[in-house]
């Protein structure tokens, strides 16, 4: 069990964040059309998994905006923005913001993702949501970079994630 903070208060996180060199766990999440989306849907592409609690928080929204800008510059790479938000909320946010370069995925029917990727917040006011993390995968789903952000209210290290590509 890892521990991060939320505005300085300790929060327990269940599961193990995939480490560099490891094979990423398979997953099934929910896309904007409510269909199941798996890791295999992105076979042959590099993947940036931007994992966060909710797009309705300022830091999470900022991470989606920043990765959207970067995603437009990346060849053979998809940026997956993964949260517990309903697909409707994710679609509404990206539509209102004009964000078209990221793929939103919900843990709505894929709760096992949270523990398999070591981001399941187990205590505190955000229990049941995802901790903030970034996992970068190559075309064969090997982990190139992973970061569990120590303070949930902080942004991830974008430069380190993008440099891993």
Curated annotation (Swiss-Prot):
Root EC class: oxidoreductase
Biological process according to GO: cellular response to hydrogen peroxide
Residues annotated as catalytic: 60
Example of a GO MF term: thioredoxin peroxidase activity
Reaction(s) catalysed by this chain's protein: a hydroperoxide + [thioredoxin]-dithiol = an alcohol + [thioredoxin]-disulfide + H2O
TM ranges: none
Top-level taxonomic group: Bacteria
InterPro entries on file: Redoxin, Thioredoxin-like_sf, Thioredoxin_domain, TPX, Tpx_CS, Tpx_Peroxidase_subfamily
EC number: 1.11.1.24
Pfam families reported for this sequence: Redoxin
This protein's record includes keyword Oxidoreductase: yes
Signal peptide: none
Physiological role: Thiol-specific peroxidase that catalyzes the reduction of hydrogen peroxide and organic hydroperoxides to water and alcohols, respectively. Plays a role in cell protection against oxidative stress by detoxifying peroxides.
Family that this chain belongs to: Belongs to the peroxiredoxin family. Tpx subfamily.
Misc. comment: The active site is a conserved redox-active cysteine residue, the peroxidatic cysteine (C(P)), which makes the nucleophilic attack on the peroxide substrate. The peroxide oxidizes the C(P)-SH to cysteine sulfenic acid (C(P)-SOH), which then reacts with another cysteine residue, the resolving cysteine (C(R)), to form a disulfide bridge. The disulfide is subsequently reduced by an appropriate electron donor to complete the catalytic cycle. In this atypical 2-Cys peroxiredoxin, C(R) is present in the same subunit to form an intramolecular disulfide.
Protein's name in the database: Thiol peroxidase
Organism, as annotated: Pseudomonas aeruginosa (strain ATCC 15692 / DSM 22644 / CIP 104116 / JCM 14847 / LMG 12228 / 1C / PRS 101 / PAO1)
Gene: tpx
């Amino acid at each position: 069990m890892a521990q991060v903070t939320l505005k300085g208060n300790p929060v327990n996180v269940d599961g193990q964040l995939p480490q560099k060199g490891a094979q990423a766990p398979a997953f099934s999440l929910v896309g904007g059309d409510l269909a199941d989306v798996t890791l295999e849907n992105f076979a042959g592409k590099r993947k940036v998994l931007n994992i966060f609690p909710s797009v309705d928080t300022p830091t999470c929204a900022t991470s989606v905006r920043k990765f959207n800008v970067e995603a437009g510059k990346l060849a053979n790479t998809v940026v997956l923005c993964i949260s517990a938000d309903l697909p409707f909320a994710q679609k509404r946010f990206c539509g209102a913001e004009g964000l078209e370069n990221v793929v939103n995925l919900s843990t709505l029917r894929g709760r096992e993702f949270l523990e398999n990727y070591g981001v399941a917040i187990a205590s505190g006011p955000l229990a049941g949501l995802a901790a903030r993390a970034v996992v970068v995968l190559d075309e064969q789903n090997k982990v190139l970079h992973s970061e569990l952000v120590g303070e949930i209210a902080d942004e991830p290290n974008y430069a380190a994630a993008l440099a891993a590509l």
